């Protein structure tokens, strides 16, 4: 089993946090200490303890060892992904230091991205440049909706073009009323050059549900 995994998505709001939580649960059930890391988190809210992001809080709660919030999310940003990531100075070295600290504490670190694969940072570099720098193998979350086949194939190709291994992909049913759901999954299986690691059904409040049962990590457990 690899010690560091990066979770990206075909778009924003496709279920990266839900799948990251499922991965953390599955790894913990297999006897590994697994922690979540979301270096950059947008749409954070002001609280009595400072800025907090809901996705990062879910990763913190789902980690198998106790972590403080700053370890999970060193950059909690207000606003949407476009403005937050371009208006705030993001230090890639700080992101790397956080990853190294968590790697020293846990068997596996699940790193969750921000938005999709090609998100621009404030210095005109892509977030994916940092992923390439750290040589993180990637798991792709495909939010099953109209247009997702195109988004998935383009994202997968971009990851491969950046020289990183695409370990696998996970389908997340974000639209319970989508027609031709089974056909969409079948086409993704045929077209994506990586194994399917799981399929999450549409679930109300998935952050409160056991999710490991929807994954099969056999393909990346060697």
UniProtKB/Swiss-Prot annotation:
Its main location: cytoplasm. Its EC number is 6.3.3.3. CDD domains: DTBS. InterPro entries: DTB_synth_BioD, P-loop_NTPase. Its cofactor is Mg(2+). Substrate binds at residue 42. The active site is at 38. ATP binds at residues 55, 112-115, 172-173, 201-203, 208. Mg(2+) binds at residues 17, 55, 112. Pfam families: AAA_26 (PF13500). It is an enzyme of class 6 (ligase). The keyword Disulfide bond does not apply. It catalyses: (7R,8S)-7,8-diammoniononanoate + CO2 + ATP = (4R,5S)-dethiobiotin + ADP + phosphate + 3 H(+). Disulfide bonds: none annotated. GO terms for molecular function: ATP binding; dethiobiotin synthase activity; magnesium ion binding. Catalyzes a mechanistically unusual reaction, the ATP-dependent insertion of CO2 between the N7 and N8 nitrogen atoms of 7,8-diaminopelargonic acid (DAPA, also called 7,8-diammoniononanoate) to form a ureido ring. Homodimer. HAMAP family: BioD. Belongs to the dethiobiotin synthetase family. This is ATP-dependent dethiobiotin synthetase BioD 2. It comes from Yersinia pestis.
């Amino acid at each position: 089993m690899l010690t560091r995994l990066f979770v990206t998505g075909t778009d924003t709001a496709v279920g990266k946090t839900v799948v990251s939580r499922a991965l953390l649960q599955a790894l913990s059930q297999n006897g590994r200490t697994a922690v979540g890391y979301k270096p950059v988190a947008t749409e954070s809210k002001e609280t009595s303890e400072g800025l907090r992001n809901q996705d990062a809080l879910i990763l913190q709660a789902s980690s198998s060892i106790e972590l403080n919030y700053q370890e999970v999310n060193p950059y909690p940003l207000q606003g949407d992904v476009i403005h937050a990531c371009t208006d705030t100075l993001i230090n890639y070295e700080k992101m790397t230091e956080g990853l190294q600290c968590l790697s020293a504490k846990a068997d596996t670190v699940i790193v969750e991205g921000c938005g999709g694969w090609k998100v621009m940072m404030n210095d005109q570099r892509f977030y994916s440049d940092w992923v390439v720098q750290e040589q993180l193998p990637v798991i792709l979350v495909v939010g099953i909706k109209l247009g997702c086949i195109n988004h998935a194939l383009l994202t997968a190709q971009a990851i491969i073009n950046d020289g990183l291994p695409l370990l696998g992909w996970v389908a997340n049913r974000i639209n319970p009323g989508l027609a031709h759901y089974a056909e969409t999954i079948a086409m993704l299986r045929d077209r994506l050059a990586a194994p399917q690691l799981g399929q999450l059904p549409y679930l109300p409040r998935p952050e409160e549900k056991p999710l490991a049962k929807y994954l099969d990590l056999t393909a990346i457990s060697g």
